[in-house]
């Protein structure tokens, strides 16, 4: 099965990537710049209480991406509503900061840890400490690699995210039936994020046959994950790379038909590059997360689609799992085969991602209360 093979391959790739490249509830406010790197933090007492003094530590990677702000806020709201004290921390995309935050959560008596890792293979020291303290760990959206400390994994179906993107391109260009030829460039995610490989592989499993038969040409020649990955999902990095591709391969007037972008922050960088350096027919641009700026771009015709991952759903599932762990109950999972972290296959709960475009964004995002209309003006 392709996903099983991918999980084995990613274990090796992520290991290699290491060489490159709670009393009151507190929330660490990330004051870093737009792509991370500034590890300055400021702790703010949010003053939550909990039945029985049960504490849950929530470690988020950064506030630089909109989605992590939403994940953290949803998690805190759901956990506090369930009666727990929440120690919510953001680490400004700095691994050592995140390790210190997790260690502080352990030392301050947190009963369960929910961790969205900055780098999948870099938390071994903190995970060992959690394991020795007997504290269960739920890996949140990003699988923590090469440790036996991870009890459960909660995420979206990451392979499906990629297939949704690939199938959208396949359908929009009628690739199964057309005799036309198309050009494509690929912008993938952070090589330190286990999910990025699943997104990439899901899309490429749909599109690779069309590359192989000549229907799609990648003029830059950059198709391997290692060539198209974007460190820390940074918009500026994606923009700079796409500007170089446009000037090197499309300045002669060749149309670029497809920009396969794994998520919205990389898509935004690609869209910025297109606006500044490209005069041809506007390409299909994919994305993921339905960030506000990207949803605005969908409305304006600058992004073709995104994949909506309702973080409220994921937060609710994690809160349910926390309660089941603390009550000694069987924990709900729906995947016990796909996600191998290098030590073991981690019992996982996968939420469903949803296709979004200009035709259904109002129903998905506004009618559901995820955004207000004013936010998308």
What do these predicted regions represent?
Residues 2-5, 22-377:
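A residue-level marker of the well-folded mature domains of exported/periplasmic proteins
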Residues 17-21:
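C-terminal motif of bacterial Sec signal peptides marking the signal peptidase cleavage site
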């Amino acid at each position: 099965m392709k996903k099983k093979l991918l999980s084995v391959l990613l274990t090796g790739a992520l290991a290699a990537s290491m060489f490159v490249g709670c009393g009151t509830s507190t929330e660490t406010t990330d004051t870093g710049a737009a792509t991370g790197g500034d590890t300055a933090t400021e702790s703010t007492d949010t003053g939550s209480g909990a039945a029985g003094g049960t504490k849950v530590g929530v470690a988020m990677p950064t506030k630089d991406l909109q989605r992590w702000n939403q994940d953290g806020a949803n998690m805190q709201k759901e956990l506090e509503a369930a009666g727990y004290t929440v120690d919510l921390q953001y680490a400004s995309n700095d691994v050592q900061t995140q390790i210190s935050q997790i260690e502080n959560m352990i030392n301050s008596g947190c009963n369960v840890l929910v961790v969205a890792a900055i780098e999948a293979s870099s938390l071994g020291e903190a995970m060992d400490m959690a394991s020795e303290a007997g504290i269960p760990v739920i890996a949140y959206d990003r699988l923590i690699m090469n440790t036996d400390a991870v009890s459960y994994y909660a995420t979206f179906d990451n392979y499906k995210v990629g297939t949704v993107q690939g199938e959208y391109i396949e359908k929009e260009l009628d690739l199964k039936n057309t005799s036309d030829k198309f050009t494509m460039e690929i912008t993938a995610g952070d090589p330190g994020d286990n999910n990025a490989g699943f997104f990439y592989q899901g899309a490429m499993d749909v599109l690779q046959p069309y590359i192989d038969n000549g229907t799609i040409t990648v003029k830059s020649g950059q198709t391997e994950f290692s060539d198209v990955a974007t460190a820390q999902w940074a918009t500026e990095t994606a923009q700079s790379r796409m500007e170089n591709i446009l000037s090197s391969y499309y300045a002669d007037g060749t149309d670029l038909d497809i920009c396969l972008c794994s998520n919205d922050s990389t898509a935004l960088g690609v869209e910025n590059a297109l606006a500044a350096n490209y005069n041809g027919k506007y390409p299909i641009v994919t994305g993921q997360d339905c960030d506000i700026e990207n949803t605005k771009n969908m409305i304006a015709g600058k992004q073709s689609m995104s994949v909506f991952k309702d973080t409220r759903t994921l937060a609710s599932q994690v809160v349910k799992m926390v309660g089941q762990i603390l009550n000694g109950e069987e924990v709900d999972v729906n995947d016990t085969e796909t996600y191998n972290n290098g030590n073991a296959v981690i019992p996982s709960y996968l939420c469903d991602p949803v296709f979004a475009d200009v035709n259904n964004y109002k129903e998905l995002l506004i009618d559901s209360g995820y955004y207000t209309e004013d936010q998308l003006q």
